[in-house]
A protein has these predicted regions:
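N-terminal small-domain helix-loop-helix segment of the aminotransferase-like
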Residues: 10-99, 106, 281-282, 287, ...
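Conserved core of the PLP fold type I
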Residues: 56, 61-197, 201, 207-225, ...
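Conserved glycine-rich beta-strand-loop-beta hairpin in the small C-terminal domain of fold type I
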Residues: 277, 294-304, 316-329, 342
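Conserved C-terminal alpha-helix-loop-beta "cap" of PLP-dependent enzymes
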Residues: 253, 328-367, 380
Length: 393
């Protein structure tokens, strides 16, 4: 049959990461490709316990439809947790999402018409690129350094670019670079957005996974005009399979997200929300996060130290203070996609960095995940990857 697809489908491509993950299902593959949490850290017994209690106590309520906004006790707890990022809100500023990724799709649907401009970090999250592409915007990449987006460059581009509708950023342990914005850059970003009347989407799934240093305030902390939409997630701090995230925004703006969610999936999973809420009642999530951070810090250190030994000195890489990823820049003559093909032949996988640049280029970069593999596999995988790089030098 000749299906008559909408023209927008021409802009929607398979995620390179999702396709790569299919290859990594083989047990012999050492995968640094996905942004996967360590499954051995999932609180399986605790979830089993509280899930039974939820069904026992809530009965049919846990299995029924619920309000689009989400389960009120959980929304209240999230509003309280936002205080650690310097954001003072109530449950009325919180909308439960089916994962933080849903908030990206909703942001595109709410703000973007064909030809509108999205300003983003260079590089930026592949999942956001794919979510926004369905709405046919133009992407303009803003240069970054170790302190985040270079605000002077941002303002120059805003002043010479028409139809800027959205600034999309990941200020904490950015995916893919692992970098974190300075407090000064966060403050200045809001000042620029206020001056030019532009909405900011702040995506922060990794912010609580800080291994060292002080927790900086969210960009939302500096928002005095209600123009910052903050997207949070429990996928990296609890369990990704529950698909639980949230949007935090000014009530007038959040109402648009509620309307869009009603048309998308009516509501976020009731049972999952109640299980998480019960978990938060009975257990200390911050204590659980400390255990995650301890393991990830050890794995980050091991990966970085092994890279220093196994990679040619010409390869540069970031040293993230938290999160899940480090970012490597190869000599310009090495194509990371070709390196990935060579690596997979040796049962090692990573994501070529070119996928994280919406306008292409930068084919000599790669993203490496350190959270998912055990220590021995990290060492062996980096050694294999280093050998493959040396063969291409």
């Amino acid at each position: 049959m000749a299906y008559k697809f909408a023209k927008r489908m021409n802009n929607i491509k398979a995620s390179e990461i999702r396709e790569l993950l299919k290859l990594t299902q083989r047990p012999e593959v050492i995968s640094f490709a996905g942004g996967l949490p360590a499954p051995e850290l999932f609180p399986v017994q605790e979830v089993k316990e509280v899930a039974a209690e939820v069904i026992e106590e809530q009965g049919t309520n846990a299995l029924q439809y619920a309000p689009t906004e989400g389960y009120d006790p959980l929304r209240e707890k999230i509003a309280k947790r936002m205080e650690k990022f310097g954001v003072n809100v109530t449950k009325n500023n919180i909308l439960m999402l089916s994962g933080g990724q849903q908030g990206l799709d909703f942001s595109g649907k709410i703000f973007l018409d064909k030809g509108d401009v999205v300003l983003c970090e260079s590089p930026t999250y592949l999942g956001a690129i794919n979510a926004f592409k369905a709405y046919e915007p133009n992407f303009v990449e803003i240069p970054t350094d170790d302190n985040g987006m270079i605000i002077e460059e941002l303002e120059k581009i805003i002043e010479t670019t028409d139809k800027v509708k959205l600034i999309y950023v990941i200020p904490d342990f950015q995916n893919p670079s692992g970098r974190t914005w300075s407090v000064e850059r966060r403050k200045k970003l809001v000042e620029v957005a206020n001056k030019h009347d532009i909405v900011i989407v702040e995506d922060n799934p990794y912010g609580e996974l800080r291994f060292e240093g002080e927790l900086p305030p969210a960009i939302k902390h500096f928002d005095t005009e209600g123009r910052v939409v903050y997207l949070g997630s429990f996928s990296k701090t609890f369990c990704p399979g529950f698909r639980l995230g949230w949007a935090c925004a000014d009530e007038k703006l959040l109402n648009k997200y509620i309307l869009v969610k009603q048309g998308a999936d009516l509501q976020t999973n009731t049972t999952a929300q109640m299980i998480l809420n019960k978990f938060l009642d009975k257990y200390d999530l911050d204590e659980h996060i400390e255990k995650i951070k301890e393991v990830y810090k050890k794995r980050r250190d091991l990966m970085i130290n092994t890279m220093k030994e196994a990679f040619p000195k010409e390869v540069k890489f970031t040293y993230p203070e938290g999160g899940l990823f480090t970012w490597a820049i190869l000599p310009e003559h090495i194509n990371a996609r070709k390196l990935a093909e060579k690596a997979i032949e040796n049962n090692v996988a990573f994501v070529p960095g070119g996928s994280f640049f919406p306008n292409g280029g930068n084919e000599n970069t790669m993203r490496l995940n350190y959270s998912n593999m055990t220590e021995d596999r990290i060492v062996e995988g980096i050694k294999r990857l280093g050998k493959a790089i040396k063969e291409m030098m």
